[in-house]
Structures are given as C-alpha cells and as structure tokens.
C-alpha cells in the first residue's frame, strides 16, 4: 500500500540455516534490502539475522514472541476503548506458554497496562519471562496477574484474548491432552459475561477454531465432539 518493493522468500526457496549459514544469509539479504521480516520458529534465528544483516530486522513471529501482532493488538485495543492504554485491562486465557501470551505480557509491562493470564499452572509462561516482565512492570506501573481461576482472570477486563491450543508443527495427538487441560478455559458467551463488563470485547490473532467450517474443525468435532475449540 505504501509503494515499497517486497520480495517473499518461502521456506522451499531459502537455504537459511541448512546449506547456508544464518550469518551469511543475513549479510547477503542486508546488501539487497532495506529491511527484513522473519517469520519462522526459532527466536535465535531472528536474533542472529538482526546481528549480522546491517538493516532493521522485524520479528514477524517465532515460537517465543509475536511483536508485530502486538502493534496491531495495541492499536485495536486503543481504537475500541475510550481509555488510555495504561488504564486498559485485558486477559489472555488458554495455553500461555508460547508467543501470544509471552508477547501480551511484554506489551502490558512496557505500556503500563493491566494483564491477567488465566491458564493451568503447567501451561504458564516460563519463569524467565515472568521475572523479566515483572521487573519492567515495576518501572512502568504495569499490573500482572497469573491465575488458574479463569473467572478471576477476566473479571473487570476490557478485552479477552486467546489463541489456538495446538501450535504449528505439533502432532494431532496433542489435541487430546490440551482439550483435557483447557476445556475450562474456552472463550464462551458465559465467560464474556463473567467479565462483568457489558463493553468487553474478544480478540484472537487468528486463525481460530471456532466452528466446524474447516477440515481441522470438522475433525475436532468428529473426534472430540467440540463445535469450536478455544472459542465458541
């Protein structure tokens, strides 16, 4: 939309980290482009690209963080609330070990927001992430709560976030385990009411398994009897 020239290198068209080192790839791409966005799995890959590219490198998504999504989410919450960012409260419910929960914690800590994580303790973010964001929140006035009680997590919030329960690349066998652990953390009309805020809004980074209208959604319904998984 802004007139930039964009080149997309799909996985099959790149030898990064396979036949060519990340360091060498970074140096070559940095000579050809003014910026690089990396979307993949390893956080170490995007950090090594940033170290050697010599141009700005943007993290489009890794297993650990999703900062570009946070730019969109912060804008969306600001657009759909009459409060300044540091007065907005939001919850994340579900599997909190990966990029969305981690990044929402970082977002809230840096902007002084009120964030609650509602998840089984076995699916909480790592201790390192928690300690890091708590230290930042002390400086910014951010409020961070981690709880296994989903109703405590959503009480009074302006937004409820979630994400898929099984991430890219995980086997089908993971579904049974996650459903058993997380069935009490689905975003349902009842959970929205539990926020006790008639203006509460739902957010999801997408794609969402919210019905049977996909092959995976239909398989989940036939296998587990769920019409919608993390959200109904």
Swiss-Prot record:
Main location: cytoplasm
Protein localization: Cytoplasm
UniProt-annotated site: Important for structural integrity, residues: 79
Coiled-coil residues: none
MF terms in GO: amino acid binding; ornithine carbamoyltransferase activity
GO biological process, one term: arginine biosynthetic process via ornithine
Pathway this chain belongs to: Amino-acid biosynthesis; L-arginine biosynthesis; L-arginine from L-ornithine and carbamoyl phosphate: step 1/3
Keywords, alphabetical: Amino-acid biosynthesis, Arginine biosynthesis, Cytoplasm, Transferase
A Gene Ontology cellular-component term: cytoplasm
Domain of life, source organism: Bacteria
Binding site for carbamoyl phosphate: 15, 39, 66-69, 204-207, 232
Binding-site positions, L-ornithine: 99, 163, 167-168
PANTHER family attached to this UniProt entry: ORNITHINE CARBAMOYLTRANSFERASE, ORNITHINE CARBAMOYLTRANSFERASE, MITOCHONDRIAL
Protein name: Ornithine carbamoyltransferase
Species the sequence originates in: Neisseria subflava
Gene that encodes it: argF
């Amino acid at each position: 939309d802004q007139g930039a020239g964009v080149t997309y290198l799909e996985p099959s068209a790149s030898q990064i980290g396979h036949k060519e080192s990340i360091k060498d790839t970074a140096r070559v791409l940095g000579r050809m482009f003014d910026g690089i966005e990396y979307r993949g799995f390893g956080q170490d890959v995007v950090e090594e690209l940033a170290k050697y590219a010599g141009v700005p490198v943007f993290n489009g998504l890794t297993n650990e963080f999703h900062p570009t999504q946070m730019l969109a989410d912060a804008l969306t919450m600001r657009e759909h609330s009459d409060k300044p960012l540091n007065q907005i409260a939001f919850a994340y419910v579900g599997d909190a070990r990966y990029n969305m929960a981690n990044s929402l914690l970082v977002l809230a800590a840096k902007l002084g927001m009120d964030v609650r994580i509602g998840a089984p303790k076995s699916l909480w973010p790592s201790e390192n992430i928690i300690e890091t964001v708590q230290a930042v929140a002390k400086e910014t006035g951010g409020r961070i709560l981690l709880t296994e009680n989903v109703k405590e997590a959503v009480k009074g919030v302006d937004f409820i976030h979630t994400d898929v329960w099984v991430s890219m690349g995980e086997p089908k066998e993971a579904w049974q385990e996650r459903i058993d652990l997380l069935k009490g953390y689905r975003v349902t009309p009842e959970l929205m009411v539990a926020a006790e805020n008639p203006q509460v809004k739902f957010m999801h980074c997408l794609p969402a398994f919210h019905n049977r209208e996909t092959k995976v959604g239909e398989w989940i319904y036939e296998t587990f009897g769920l019409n919608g998984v993390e959200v109904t």
